[in-house]
Amino acid sequence: MILAAGFSSRMKAFKPLLPVGGKPMVQRCIDLFLDNGITDIVVVTGHYREHIEPVIRDAGACPVFHPGFASGMLGSIQQGIAKIRPGQTGFFLLPTDIPAIRPATVARMIKKFQSDPHRIIMPCFNDMPGHPPLIPCEFKDRILALKESSTLRDLMTAQKDRTVNLKFHDRGILMDADNQDGYRRVESKVRSLDIPDREECLSIVDQELPKKHPIRDHLAQVAMTALKLAHAVSGPVNVDLVIAAALLHDIRRMEKNHAAAGAELLQGLGFNRVAKVVGQHMNIALDPQAPVRETELVYFADKVCNGPHLDLNYHQRFRHCLEKMPWAANSIWKRYENTRHIQARIEACAGQSITDILAD
């Protein structure tokens, strides 16, 4: 159930029809559920219904008009719940001004609900609850019985023992387009949903690494170094992708073949482009005819960071590795040659030396 009945008074424009990522906000919310195989989608309308309802129908959902929409959100929720068909086991509840949620988030909530269909599934980011909750239909009558002075939040707060707080690395569950600033943030977020932002990367790091693990400092240094490289080179470099991949490149450092293990983790979270970069930060296939890309920048930044410190004398470190592990000479030599070639490519592209690029 999607709520789109309000006046959008703080926005000074009708939010559900504002464009987000090239489509109306309400359509993006509808697509979030259609992409997960949910076809029974109700959108509660009120203000501006004559304009929004055709958009809702064209997007594949069913508009339900709430005549008393001016009285507040609870009435709209009750109007939508009354339209839930018998036999349904649960429903999502999403205000239309929260459109920057990843489809993978909804998919995981569905999977959890299927194994535990009598509990409310509440998505959380950094321990903060967000949207959309997935509510068992057995709560339907209780919601319909709520008085006008009550809120759905009151009912759900009273059901803490029947609520599963499910952690996600998805800040979009907290982001609403309630005003112009919020709208701009949501618009920016939607443009790069397949790349975790800095807070989401740190959420992943917190899940995977102990608080004071030394790899954390290395990740931060590699990210800072890769960012400087990205700003120095010209061409089609996605800076957000560079930062995310750098912050996460050693996320599974303690595992055998940690690059592949890290890539597998990130693919499972829906971050395929980041996974591709992380998966190549140890062994990379170079194309000398192509522009310098994100994969090379993260690869090189990793090689010039010795633990938490920038150390441009990677030549000495590779020699030490050869002495320490002569049985791995072929792979070590290949990585060294790749590092040298990438340095030359970056310097040619930037028109300055690596020393100058990475100077404080």
Q: What do the PLM-derived regions correspond to, one by one?
A:
Residues 1-46, 50:
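N-terminal glycine-rich phosphate-binding loop and ensuing alpha1 helix
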Residues 25-40, 79-83, 225-232:
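A short, N-terminal amphipathic alpha-helix
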Residues 58-71:
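Conserved donor nucleotide-binding strand/loop of the catalytic core
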Residues 70-141:
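Conserved beta-loop-beta/alpha segment of the NTase-like Rossmann-fold superfamily
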Residues 147-200:
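Conserved alpha/beta core of the MobA/IspD/sugar-nucleotide pyrophosphorylase nucleotidyltransferase superfamily
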Residues 173-176, 188, 328-360:
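Charged phosphate-binding loop/patch that engages nucleotide di/tri-phosphates or the phosphate backbone
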Residues 198-218, 223, 245-251:
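Active-site flanking loop/helix segments enriched in acidic
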Residues 209, 230-327:
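Divalent metal-dependent catalytic cores for phosphoryl transfer on phosphate-bearing substrates
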